């Protein structure tokens, strides 16, 4: 499988489990723990990494309210199963999605929340600990991240997106990429 192939040229140091909304309806929480245990045990065995840290992200508390997420009313029950799993299994750490916000679709987290969640994941991984509340300084850290200069690759990607979305012409795209590469 791809994970085993990737291990040949890189080091696998952790696994991020981000379930999201799919099982947060129709009583699926009742079998969630058992299903997750089968998956995690099989994954650790297949990768020959029995002690690899698993960082488990909770579901956002914006679910069950509007848009495509309106039917996901059992997200708190899934979160309880995820948290229970992380507390009971070795080298598993739960990361709360408390306070994160969604895109207008009501089901996916927005860009700022993705950054906050990423900071929480990093904190859980680097400290090998559960993150049960928003980080005290996450707003300041997100501001710092967002105010930094973009890398050359990021600048080219943004120009590529503008071109793909028809915001700039091909000639403008080539001109901008050439300028970025020459800076």
Q: Which sequence ranges carry the predicted segments?
A:
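Cell-envelope and extracellular/periplasmic
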Residues: 1-183
């Amino acid at each position: 499988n791809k994970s085993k192939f990737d291990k040949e040229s890189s080091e696998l140091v952790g696994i991020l489990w981000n379930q999201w909304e799919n099982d947060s309806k129709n009583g699926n929480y009742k079998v969630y723990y058992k299903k997750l245990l089968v998956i995690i045990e099989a994954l650790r065995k297949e990768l020959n990494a029995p002690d690899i840290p698993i960082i488990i992200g909770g579901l956002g508390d914006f679910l069950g309210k509007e848009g495509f997420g309106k039917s996901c009313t059992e997200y708190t029950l899934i979160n309880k199963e995820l948290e229970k799993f992380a507390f009971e299994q070795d080298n598993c750490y739960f990361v709360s999605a408390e306070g994160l916000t969604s895109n207008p679709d009501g089901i996916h987290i927005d860009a700022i929340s993705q950054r906050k969640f990423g900071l929480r994941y990093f904190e859980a991984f680097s400290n090998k600990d559960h993150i049960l509340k928003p980080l005290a300084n996450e707003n300041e850290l997100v501001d710092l991240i967002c105010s930094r200069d973009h890398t050359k690759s990021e600048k080219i990607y943004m120009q590529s997106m503008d071109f793909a979305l028809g915001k700039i012409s091909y000639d403008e795209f080539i001109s901008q990429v050439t300028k970025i590469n020459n800076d």
